[in-house]
From Swiss-Prot:
Family matches, as SUPFAM superfamilies: WD40 repeat-like
Pfam families to which the protein is assigned, alphabetical: WD40
Keyword Nucleus annotated: yes
Protein name listed in UniProt: Polyadenylation factor subunit 2
Cystine pairs: none
One of the record's GO cellular component terms: chromatin
Species annotation: Eremothecium gossypii (strain ATCC 10895 / CBS 109.51 / FGSC 9923 / NRRL Y-1056)
Job of this protein: Required for 3'-end cleavage and polyadenylation of pre-mRNAs. Also involved in chromosome segregation where it has a role in chromosome attachment to the mitotic spindle.
Segments of this protein annotated with the region Disordered: 411-432
Length: 449
């Protein structure tokens, strides 16, 4: 709106970034219907239009599915610590739970705020959707469980289901039962249809921090502050196996969600352990760092990729098929993803966006990088700069996008080429930095093939 004699003020329209997967899915369907082979993505910006949905890259091209690009920052007007986030089953919205007991909904494409409601009287610590997407279960710091419909109509309250703070919830593969764990040292199995407690799993000697139900079998895993991992038979309530070897609190235990062949365990002894269930829980790999890992999420499409959040606010992505013989096993690291400890990570059901929450009271969205994206490493998540770029990144201003020149998209200055944490090439090839000295050699989508 232009200035006029009536004193009106000129307003500038800013561009809001939107991440929409409709067009790539339509193109992928067309390619498959007519048996057209997918184009190989080359390190050139013109190949951006050829990027397909994550489901198309299950082979060696899975590197394209790693979310390396900061997309948006969201936060409530009244900010609280965010202990849990989860995507709605169709992936259109992100549900955010806070220490104030509120649920807030954020759009999963344009990342704008949609609604907020008071869900619990105390801090909401855990929540999970059923596999069918028909129900949402949440738990709070008082040990109360609430069951919600997808429209957030509350249908049942299990008051004081636990005597201490709830730590984790997991549905069975059939959605007929669910398991909960708490700081009261026990796990409980509940009948979902009537809300009745069926079994109490006792065996841990301290707070139970995590639990998960196998996606295809009648098997429950739990991790506790007593440094033990236990496997349970939900039919009998008996402990069938105990895994030793951890030196500190077990923070997270998570089965691989698609096949369930792998188990990831995060511990406060600064390690991540991967166990292979097909080989009698043999320890497949151990990843150690000098910083505590706090949260973990498996990629919903690629079975070997998972992401972890660190105590110092960093986010690291791992690929079990990647050569981890070097001193930095992560295939990609975002060193300044958050300003404080990362409390929760959640992949979109499609796998193209990763949402992260932290004790800095913000939610941040991460998408896949475009080929040779000059902003992929030139933003505050890598260089820790709080001026200009940080402001534009938060507001999604059009100035945050690097302008085009007569030679194409402007590249970072030569003194900014080493921003971030350089990693080796995931596909084992040489970085394209050998051909263009202005591109960071970081072994990432569009930067190293």
């Amino acid at each position: 709106m232009n200035s006029a004699n009536d004193g009106s003020v000129k307003k500038y329209v800013s561009q809001r970034r939107t991440v929409d997967m409709s067009s790539p899915y339509d193109r992928l369907y067309f390619y498959k219907k007519h048996a057209i082979p997918l184009r190989t993505i080359q390190p050139e910006s013109t190949y951006t239009a050829d990027i397909m949905p994550p489901d198309a890259y299950r082979d060696h091209r899975r590197v394209l599915n790693i979310p390396t690009k900061f997309t948006h920052l969201s936060s409530n007007k009244v900010k609280h610590v965010i202990p849990a986030i989860t995507w709605t089953p169709e992936g259109r919205r992100l549900v955010v739970a806070t220490y104030s007991g509120e649920f807030s909904l954020w759009n999963g494409s344009s990342f704008n705020f949609e609604s907020i409601m008071q869900a619990h009287d105390s801090a909401v610590t855990v929540m999970q959707y059923s596999h069918a997407g028909d129900w949402l279960i949440s738990g709070d710091a008082d040990g109360t469980i609430k069951i919600w419909q997808p429209n957030f109509n509350m249908v049942k309250v299990l008051d004081r289901a636990h005597t201490e703070c709830m730590r984790d919830i997991s549905f069975s593969y059939s959605d007929q039962k669910f398991v909960t764990c708490s700081d009261d040292n026990v796990l409980k199995i509940w009948n979902f249809s009537n809300g009745q407690q069926e079994r109490v799993l006792s065996g841990h000697h301290w707070d139970v921090k995590s639990c998960d139900w196998h996606p295809k079998m009648g098997l429950i895993v739990s991790g506790s502050k007593d440094n033990l991992i236990k496997l349970w038979d939900p039919r009998t309530g008996r402990n069938v196996s105990t895994i030793l070897g951890l030196k500190h609190t077990v923070i997270k235990t998570k089965f691989q969600p698609t096949q369930g062949n792998l188990l990831a365990v995060v511990s406060k002894d600064k390690s991540i352990k991967i166990y292979d269930m097909r080989q009698h829980m043999r320890e497949l790999q151990t990843i150690r760092d000098d910083m505590d890992y706090m949260s973990l999420s498996w990629h919903p499409i690629n079975e070997t990729i998972f992401s972890v959040g660190c105590y110092n606010g960093a986010i690291k992505h791992f690929d079990l098929l990647h050569d981890n013989s070097n001193s930095t096993p992560a295939c990609h690291t975002i060193p300044y993803a958050h300003e404080k400890s990362v409390t929760s990570l959640a992949y979109s059901p499609v796998g193209h966006i990763l949402a992260s929450a932290a004790k800095d009271r913000t939610i941040r969205f991460w998408a896949r990088s475009r080929p040779v994206d000059p902003n992929a490493f030139d933003d505050p998540t890598y260089n820790n700069k709080k001026v200009n770029a940080w402001y534009f990144g938060i507001n999604n201003n059009i100035n945050a996008v690097r302008p085009k020149t007569e030679h194409g998209i402007a590249l970072p200055p030569a003194n900014e080429t080493n921003l971030g944490t350089p990693q080796p090439s995931i596909l084992g090839s040489e970085s394209i930095a050998a051909n263009n000295g202005n591109v960071p050699a970081s072994g990432l989508p569009g930067l190293s093939f």
